[in-house]
Regions:
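Secondary-structure boundary elements
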Residues: 107, 141-149, 155-330
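Hydrophobic/aromatic-rich core segments of domains that either
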Residues: 321-328, 333, 338-425
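Bacterial N-terminal signal peptides
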Residues: 11-21
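Extracytoplasmic
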Residues: 469-626
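Long, compositionally biased intrinsically disordered regions
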Residues: 395-506
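Bacterial N-terminal signal peptides that target proteins for export
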Residues: 2-12
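Non-catalytic protein-protein interaction scaffold segments in large eukaryotic complex-forming proteins
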Residues: 29-210
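Boundary at the C-terminal end of the N-terminal hydrophobic targeting segment
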Residues: 24-28
């Protein structure tokens, strides 16, 4: 049964549960407990109190002079003068964060003072036993004894899931290092994680285990994407689907090498898109635009937005076929920022590239992972976004950078957890205020970025946020086409096969792009870009004059289009382009009258046109057409 309309209605509810930081969530509402639940709550509360007492005894001694200098320096950040910038035509004031040069300069001094403190507490920062104690405290604090008891009171299975988690120090540390469970719902996270482990032996070790845990921690609502399917069942389906895609070589080569603490694996599954849409967009990229799967990582996969989802206002989708999903409809006529961001996101998700929404005031955009760091796409820099995954955008970026150093990142967490046990305030305004230890944790993150020389790689396609025209000149790469892909052949029945690369000058231009097919052959894409039509010219030797049925083997993602053939200069023939939904399909035969010997056939599209990919043309003697 088709579920796209139902699923669309729950997108917003899904997004509201996606925060990953254990320190950014509000305290959940109290759950009504049974008598057994109240006993469990008392048990968890005592466990939390004992851990808190143990942690407060672990506080290392800090040189008071160094502590005072650090406190003084980061306190001065509140006095930095803000700057005003024009972002997408609107004035935006920036005070806190690297977007303000004065703030960034002052924060260098704060980091220097923080390093002096960190040098004195190195022994504390590397303690494994202390780390396990603090991680368990952080988990109980984030989950709350009441919510843990509310889950455990449901039955023996739920109680066993909680016991498994709370008795496994290694799992607790891993869980909290990767950001904890969304919304503090550790019971649901364990239910999903256990289901994935039961469904796949490989999910017990290596990056497969990290990925299984990360996905379970991220999506902790009762359902995931499909509103009538329990979350654990849905996540198992996604995991097995992606596992098969990984085995089949469909996922990106970097998928198993994302590394770091594993935090980025939280974002490889889509936040709201069905498996049907995921599989369809894989087909689009692999069949229709395989060149987009080989680009450098800023534009890899999401380039499909730039090539095939034009920025168009006022699109009426009411008359579009009801059996198409929203994603499929966006390809028909384009759309404004939201549809473009949605297509960009799912194009990354489908191939295992961590992706997120990156909204800014009045604009929808996206952000995704690259081997060099996260970048915003088709929108402004992180500075100017409203939130990323429920976190302040610059804190999300810093988190993603610091997670690249698992050892250093755990030290940052130890400082935070100690401060939490001591009742300190959380850092605010990008490290401008907060308690001593928790702020030190923030600056330990910054030290990682500086020590590892991690760069902010900035925006991608910001100039295309609300435009189809880039101010940056695009370099058109030429491809070498082996002769075997240019050879015209004649079958025993007289059918002539003309590879699309057998044209007179197989050269890439604004509209025409020759590329390697996913199966190792060659294909051409005739795209949206360019002001004037471009031609493909073919010379074909016909052994016997007569009428031939012409077909083209095509792949399309739009409908109601034609292309034009010009035969031997005189004859013009329209050919209907089928809507193939990203499959490969032959056009309906059209009759061409050809002479014996050399014939010239020109191919072009009417303007304005939509994209079409072609592998070959065929000419079949009319008597053989069925």
């Amino acid at each position: 049964m088709k579920k796209h309309d139902t699923i669309k209605s729950v997108w917003i509810m899904t997004i509201l549960t996606l925060s990953t930081s254990v320190f950014t969530m509000g305290r959940p509402a109290e759950i009504d407990l049974t008598p057994e639940g109240k006993k469990l709550q008392a048990h968890y509360s005592k466990m939390l109190a004992d851990l808190k007492e143990a942690i407060t005894r672990l506080e290392p001694k800090v040189n008071e002079k160094k502590k005072a200098e650090f406190t003084k320096q980061f306190g001065a950040l509140e006095n930095v003068t803000p700057v005003t910038e024009i972002v997408m035509g609107n004035e935006r004031t920036v005070k806190y964060g690297p977007g303000n040069p004065a703030f960034a300069k002052k924060q260098v001094e704060v980091l220097t003072a923080a390093r002096a403190v960190m040098k004195d507490i190195e022994a504390f920062l590397i303690g494994d036993k202390e780390q396990a104690t603090m991680a368990k405290f952080a988990l109980l604090t984030h989950a709350t004894p009441n919510r843990l008891a509310g889950f455990a009171q449901k039955g023996e299975e739920e109680k066993a899931l909680m016991d498994t988690l709370l008795n496994d120090d290694k799992l607790i540390v891993q869980t909290m290092t990767m950001g904890g469970a969304g919304g503090g719902r550790y019971g649901q996270a364990m239910r999903s994680y256990t289901a994935i482990r039961k469904a796949s032996e490989r999910s017990h070790e290596g990056f497969f285990q990290v990925w299984a845990l990360a996905a379970s921690l991220q999506y902790t609502s009762d359902t995931y994407v499909y509103p009538d399917v329990p979350a654990a069942d849905s996540l198992v389906r996604y995991y097995l689907n992606y596992l098969k895609a990984y085995d089949d070589g469909i996922l990106d080569p970097a998928f198993s090498k994302i590394g770091g603490t594993g935090w980025n694996y939280r974002f490889v599954f889509p936040d709201s898109y069905t498996l049907e849409d995921v599989e369809w967009i894989r087909k689009v990229l692999r069949n229709y635009r395989p060149d987009h799967t080989r680009l450098e990582y800023r534009w890899r996969y999401c380039r499909i937005v730039r090539s095939d989802i034009p920025y168009v206002m006022g699109v009426d989708r009411s008359g579009m076929p009801a059996d198409l999903s929203s994603i499929q409809k966006f390809f028909l006529k384009g759309g404004i920022c939201g549809p473009r961001a949605f297509v960009g996101q799912i194009s990354g998700y489908a191939f295992g590239i961590p992706s997120r929404r990156a909204p800014s005031p009045g604009h929808g955009a996206m952000a995704h992972w690259t081997p060099d760091g996260w970048t915003t796409v088709l929108g402004p820099h992180f500075y100017f976004c409203k939130h990323i995954n429920g976190m302040p955008p610059m804190e999300f970026l810093l988190e993603s950078q610091a997670q690249q150093d698992p050892k250093g990142f755990k030290q940052a967490l130890m400082c935070e957890w100690l401060g939490q046990a001591l009742g300190e305030e959380a850092p605010r305004n990008y490290g401008s205020s907060g308690g001593f230890w928790r702020s030190l944790g923030f600056y330990r993150r910054q030290a990682i970025v500086e020590d590892q020389k991690i760069k902010d790689i900035g925006t991608t396609g910001e100039e295309l946020a609300e435009s189809n025209v880039s101010s940056k000149k695009e370099e058109i790469e030429q491809v070498e086409i082996p002769e075997k892909f240019r050879e015209i052949t004649v079958a025993k029945d007289g059918t002539i096969t003309i590879p699309v690369a057998a044209c007179r000058l197989p050269k890439n231009g604004e509209k025409i792009r020759f590329m390697k097919s996913i199966d190792g052959g060659m294909q051409v894409h005739y795209g949206l870009k360019g002001r004037r039509p471009e031609l493909l010219s073919y010379t074909v030797e016909i052994p016997k004059a007569g009428n031939y049925g012409f077909t083209a083997h095509v792949c399309t993602v739009t409908m109601d289009r034609k292309f034009l053939l010009r035969v031997n200069r005189r004859t013009l023939v329209d050919v209907d382009i089928p809507y193939t939904k990203a499959d490969w399909m032959d056009t309906e035969p059209v009759e061409l009258e050809l002479k014996e010997g050399r014939n010239r056939i020109l191919f072009t599209q009417y303007a304005p046109n939509k994209g079409i990919s072609i592998k070959e043309f065929k000419l079949k003697p009319m008597g053989e057409i069925q």
